[in-house]
Amino acid sequence: MEVPPAVFINSCPNCGLDVSSERLAKGSVCDKCLDEELEFNGVYDLAKKLHERGTLKNLKNVLELHREFSKVERIFKEALGYPPLGPQRSWVLRVLRGESFAIIAPPGLGKTTFGLLMSLYFSSNKKRTIGIFPTRTIVAQSVSRLQDLSTKLELAPRIIYYHAGLTQGEKKEVLSALESNDFDIFLTTSRFVIDNLDTLKRVDYNFLFVDDVDTALKSSKSAKSILQLSGFSEDDIEKTRELLRQARKDETAFRKIAELRQGKLEGKVVVFSSATITKGNPVMSALMGFRPG
């Protein structure tokens, strides 16, 4: 039985006006946005056509997302010899959408390399990254890897790093650079975050990458420091803890947590990396709005 045509009120994905079921079935938009009767295989092709016609509105973000993904894809190809593969594609898209999330994946899937390459993408857009690693050895390895990747990409980001092995003079230089936001990428340990939280909270950054978050979660002080670095106050943390206690009886608890979260992460993307999170931090997960990726 053939379904008769229908008109859906305020349902055009591009302008919000009325659109026919026939056009929607073809992956298209209303006749005000596109007078031609065309069929589209994907939303990117549709957005590109609307851009050509000068009628692109609500779908503009689709075109921008595709352009930025192409930039990241080029970075991966030039640095590694291949584009983002498998779950890396999903991780890239989520970062480009401005999502904060936790990567839970076994070793060998390129979680750390993904974080380093995304930091280079952000620096190419004049945006700062903070990378947190469990030990000074891994910080040193990551700095070396980042420098190699930068050379392959012919980029020259201002990379600074801090760990216990630096001289007093080197430590002072790093702290001065942090105070003045005179860097593109900063790599350090979770211990540094605890000891220098006030300094880091004044840093204007866009991307926070926490490698091996399991180690950070072993210390409540470390987990709390990372939440505060992300933009949450001690009051936010305590209020969330109390709301989680009430969640079984109060159906509005999670909505209240979501409202608390709104605006706190604005302009920032926070990504946690883990091989297997066996014991999570419910306050951190709730405040960050994490869902595994």
Language-model features, listed with the residues they occupy:
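N-terminal helicase ATP-binding lobe
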Residues: 1-293
